[in-house]
Amino acid sequence: MPSLLFCGPKLAACGIVLSVWGVIMLSMLGIFFSAKSAVLIEDVPFTEEDIRNDKDPPQIIYGLYNQVGINCFIAAAIYVGVGAVSLCQVRLNKRQEYMVT
């Protein structure tokens, strides 16, 4: 029977730690972008044409803030998936310790 185990216990633990940090960090960034934090304006991808060509420029910037916030939440969800895979690897490593071959 093939095993789903593809990494060792240290790498799996490292994956869990990085996933937890990534979820916390990206969730906070997503919240701050959704709240349209002025400090993060440098990270919003807009050009001068976006401001000049529109009659209501703040709405374009607010839409870009929301889009970046959604991207952060999507990345946090990917980190949740990586954390779940790492947790499965930790459990498989622990089970392999108890198996006698």
Curated annotation (Swiss-Prot):
The keyword DNA-binding does not apply. It comes from Danio rerio. GO terms for molecular function: RNA endonuclease activity. Keywords: Endonuclease, Hydrolase, Membrane, Nuclease, Transmembrane, Transmembrane helix. It is found in: Membrane. The keyword rRNA-binding does not apply. Endoribonuclease which preferentially cleaves ApU and ApG phosphodiester bonds. This is Ribonuclease kappa-B. Belongs to the RNase K family. GO terms for cellular component: membrane. The gene is rnasekb. The lineage of its organism: Eukaryota, Metazoa, Chordata, Craniata, Vertebrata. The chain crosses the membrane at residues 13-33, 68-88. PANTHER family: RIBONUCLEASE KAPPA. Its EC number is 3.1.-.-. InterPro entries: Ribonucl_Kappa, RNase_K. It comes from the Eukaryota. It is a multi-pass membrane protein. Its main location: membrane.
